[in-house]
Structure formats: C-alpha cells, structure tokens
Design a protein with these regions (language model features):
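Feature captures outer-membrane beta-barrel proteins of Gram-negative bacteria and organelles
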Residues: 38-39, 68-79, 100-114, 123, ...
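Positively charged n-region of N-terminal signal peptides that target proteins for export
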Residues: 1-4
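Flexible, glycine-rich linker and terminal segments associated
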Residues: 224-226, 230-290
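Extracellular loop and loop/strand-boundary signature of outer-membrane beta-barrel proteins
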Residues: 135-137, 173, 199-201
C-alpha cells in the first residue's frame, strides 16, 4: 500500500510543479502556524474553513501585495498516510486581482507510536505563490514549489508533561538567503482545561526566516478558531492571521467511543447470558441427583 501511495504522490507532485505558483496554508490541524510537521490527518478526517492574513501596515495601499487576503481551504486525510490540502485565496481589497489556487500534498513515511522512540516523519510539497501575502522579492524567490521533510516527536517531561518538538528541512520559502535549502523548527503543546470545554493548542516556530506563534481552540463540536502572528522578529514585516474552520474529527471520536461502549456492553451481556445459562444447567443437573 505504501509503495502505491508513494507512486501516486510523486505523480501528483510533478503535476503540481508545472502548474502556476500559489500560496501555501497556515494554521492547519496537522501543521503549526506556517510550517509543516511529521504528521497527517487520519483517514476520513477533513477540515474546512477560511483564514485571513494581513500586515500591520495594511492601511498603506501603495502596493497591492500589502493588502488583506482571505482564503477558503479544505484539508483531508487518506489511508492514514496521505494528506491533501486545497486552497482558494484572493485579495480582499482588490476583488479583480488574480485568484490564487493551491494544492499541497504531504505523505507520512513513519507514524509515531503512542510509546517508543520512533518519531513521525513526513515529506511533502507546497505550491506557493506569494503575490498577496508577501513582498515582490519574496514572491520572486518562491516561484517554484517548496519541498520539505518534517520530523515530529512527543515528549513527556516533569511539570511540562506532554509537548511536541518538530524539525525539518525544506527548499524555497524555508531556505536561507544564500542557500537553496533551509531548516525550520517548532514546539506545540495542547491543553484541555475544564473551563474551556475543548482543547487549546499553543504553537511556536521558526520557518527559516522568522519567528511565528499561534493559538488554536477546538470545541467539542469540531469548531476551530485560531489566531497567529508571523515575523515577530521583524516588526516591519509583522503580519497577523485569523482562521475559523470545522473538522469532523470530534464527531468521529464520539462515534468511535460509542462503538467501543456498544462492544463492551455486548460482551458483558454475552457473559451474563452465559453465566445464567451455566447456572441453570448446573441447577438442572443437581435436581435429578437430589431426587
């Protein structure tokens, strides 16, 4: 199965490489703020929503690429190995501008087990076109797709408890100024406070050029609200992100939990019926002997 998935991944990647460049994704469920991780969405799980990105100096319309931008996206997982992301974005202040479309792919090579030292490892390709979100210089340097390899590992430390470390290497937007390849890294931690009635995920990352941070809140119904900031180390390039989406993951978790309860209840009922039948058989055996 993995061999066929790799073949499909390579074929689709080649198709993307020769298409028009567009922008990548931010604040996705399997990623951090703007960098990927060594994880993918599980089979049958999808996320659909929208996100907004704008610079601090977005009121200056002397250059269209500093304007606010809105995107609609869909991410879904296949076979617990492949994640596909589709994004449709446009310049909010200039509706007549060219619409950007992207298809991002990520293939899971190694799945991180619940216990053990094996990390999660994934490779992927992002089809980037930074006409809206970035400067002309950045867009010019990102005309080709960005390929990456990401590794993720969860650690359990005293007081800190569970947190995840993510590192990777990538081309194009991840690359350093004088290099074709760069590194990225990040930290993520999830909380489940009683007052929140949901999960809260905090993220901090370095994407090869800047430091980004984000906060995501996931309700029990699957609604996700995320806020983020990019380029914290460069006030002149500081930009903000906001996203709202919905995922079916919580519903599937409830269905899975309900199925487990049904299986357990069925097993208990069968055990009870067997115990009653055995008791009745033993009683029937004892009655003739007593006579």
């Amino acid at each position: 199965m993995l061999r066929y998935l790799i073949s499909i991944f390579l074929v689709v990647s080649v198709a993307i490489v020769v298409s028009n460049p567009v922008r990548g994704e931010v604040l996705t469920g399997s990623g951090l703020v703007d960098v990927p991780t060594g994880r993918v969405l599980q089979h049958g799980i999808f996320e659909a929503g929208t996100y907004l990105g704008f610079r601090e100096d977005g009121t200056d319309r002397s250059s269209a690429n500093l304007g606010d931008a809105v995107a609609v996206r869909l991410n879904f997982g296949l076979f617990d190995r492949l994640e596909v992301g589709l994004t449709h974005l446009w310049d909010e202040e200039n509706p007549d501008s060219t619409v950007a479309r992207t298809a991002n792919l990520k293939l899971l090579l190694l799945k991180e087990p619940e216990t053990g030292v094996v990390p999660g490892v994934a490779i992927g390709i992002e089809k980037l076109g930074n006409k809206v979100f970035s400067s002309d210089a950045e867009a010019e340097g990102s005309e080709t797709p960005s390929a990456f390899l990401a590794v993720s590992k969860t650690f359990n430390l005293p007081r800190v408890h569970l947190f995840s470390l993510h590192v990777g290497v990538g081309t194009q937007r991840f690359a350093f100024e004088e290099s074709r390849v760069g590194v990225f890294a990040g930290l993520s931690k999830e909380f489940r406070p009683a007052f929140a009635r949901g999960d809260i995920a905090m993220r901090l990352e370095f994407d090869g050029s800047g430091v980004n941070t984000g906060l995501r809140y996931i309700t029990s119904s699957g609604l996700q609200v995320a806020l983020g900031a990019e380029a914290l180390n460069n006030p002149d390039e500081l930009r903000y992100l906001a996203a709202v989406s919905w995922t079916n993951e919580k519903i599937l978790e409830r269905i899975d939990a309900m199925n487990k309860l049904i299986i357990r209840a069925t097993a208990l009922r069968n055990e009870t019926e067997r115990a009653i039948s055995k008791k009745a058989a033993d009683k029937a055996t004892e009655t003739p002997s007593s006579q």
